[in-house]
Amino acid sequence: MIKQYLQVTKPGIIFGNLISVIGGFLLASKGDIDYPLFLSTLLGVSLVVASGCVFNNYIDRDIDKIMERTKNRVLVKGLIDPKVSLIYASVLGIAGMLLLYVAANALAMMLAVIGFVIYVGVYSLYMKRKSVYGTLIGSLSGAAPPVIGYCAVTGQFDTGALILLLIFSLWQMPHSYAIAIFRFKDYQAANIPVLPVIKGISVTKNHITLYILAFMVATLMLTLSGYAGYKYLVVAAAVSVWWLGMALRGYKATNDSVWARKLFVFSIIAITSLSVMMSVDFNVHSSAVLLTYAG
């Protein structure tokens, strides 16, 4: 039973988000790490992400049973009562948000709430099923964790937080489109209006290329604005150029599914590399404050 309650939270997604939280937190810490705050932030974000994933599993029960990769999920197979899953998700979410408020600050909690509402309320309940722009909306919630980590330290939404939001939002797009290409038949069968299904794979390749170019610019801004060092810059430039090269090779790909899967795998390598580098190669910087909270 414990295994099922763990599976429904999508541990892989939680782990991936924690890597970005660590990157944002350590970038803002600049070597002066508050370990109790660090652990509390990781736990708080984990609980909120887990809550969102459980709600998503509940909402998507009808389409999950159609898709090959999701047909064996816990709620689809009836291993957990749907009503119980709602209570479970609510408890996880409330606990995570309260922890962020108490241990970090109101801004970190507010960002978690915004990310949660976008993912569950806007994306999962409506945009995913109704609009080709669902991926774009979902990318905002996917970019929330590193910004939460950053703001848990600073207590303010400054230029650094905005750049992180841009980097991770832009990264989400080619990452998600790659999944939509190699899982094309699943999305088509479930009638989910992702870009490859609605506009075609050729158009999606153009979008992937443009988003990677924008991602490249955003990653460099972290150094150019004085938040990260030149070692980070070298790694950011290298992974961005390599990722762009992979995207361009897609125009000559004989098997779009194989190409998209490789692009997807490298997207994970790319964002993990950036998260690690911003954690260790930071600059002390006088930030431009965009939003702050005192209380």
Swiss-Prot record:
Pathway annotation from the record: Porphyrin-containing compound metabolism; heme O biosynthesis; heme O from protoheme: step 1/1
Main subcellular localisation: membrane
InterPro entries (UniProt xref): Protohaem_IX_farnesylTrfase (IPR006369), UbiA_prenyltransferase (IPR000537), UbiA_prenylTrfase_CS (IPR030470), UbiA_sf (IPR044878)
GO MF term list: protoheme IX farnesyltransferase activity
EC number: 2.5.1.141
Cellular component GO terms held in the UniProt record: plasma membrane
Keyword Transmembrane helix carried by entry: yes
Species whose genome carries this gene: Yersinia pseudotuberculosis serotype O:1b (strain IP 31758)
Name listed for the protein in its UniProt record: Protoheme IX farnesyltransferase
Organism phylogeny: Bacteria, Pseudomonadati, Pseudomonadota, Gammaproteobacteria, Enterobacterales
Catalytic activity: heme b + (2E,6E)-farnesyl diphosphate + H2O = Fe(II)-heme o + diphosphate
Membrane topology: Multi-pass membrane protein
Subcellular compartments: Cell inner membrane
A Pfam family: UbiA
